[in-house]
Amino acid sequence: DVIVLDPPPAMGFLGLNVMAAATGLLIPVPARQLDYLSTIHFMETIADNIEILEENGTPVDYGFIRVVCSAYTPSKPGEADMWKMMQATYANFLLSQPILASEEIKNATQAFRSIYESKPSAAHATYQRCRDNLDAVFGEVLQQIREQWPSQSISKRASDTVASVAA
C-alpha cells in the first residue's frame, strides 16, 4: 500500500510522527527563491529530527528522498533560473520533471478534488497537458516506490497504474 501524508513543514508532533512512519520522502518545492531558501532550512531541520528520532530508538531508513519542483512556470522571470539552481543543488534527488503551474490544478483544488477527479475547466488541450505533466511526475514517483518493493515489476508502465488509480 502507498499512503501519502502531507504534514505542514513545521516539525511538531505530526511532522515527527510522519517522519518516523515514512519509508520515503517526496518534498515539493515551488520554483521561487523564498521557497527554495525555506526548503534548505527545512532539510536542515529534517536532519536534526532524524538524529533525535534515532537517539530515542526510532531508526530512520528512507528508501528514497526526492525533491519535486512544483507550481513551475518556465515563462515567469526567475523561475527558469530557480529550476536550474534546484537542478544544481539537489542533483540526483530532484525529479527530472517539474509540476507545471496550471489553472486546472487550482480549479480542482478549489473544488476539493484532484485533477484526476475533475472535468476540464478550460480547453480540453489545457486539461490534457496538465494530466500528461502530472502523469509524468507521478510516474517518476511510482518508479521510486516500486524500487522499494522487490515483488513489483518495475517495467510496468507508470501511466497505466496512475490511470487505474484515478479511475
Where are these regions (language model features)?
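Conserved catalytic-core segment of NTP-binding enzymes
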Residues: 2-94
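C-terminal lobe/tail of nucleotide-utilizing enzymes
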Residues: 56-167
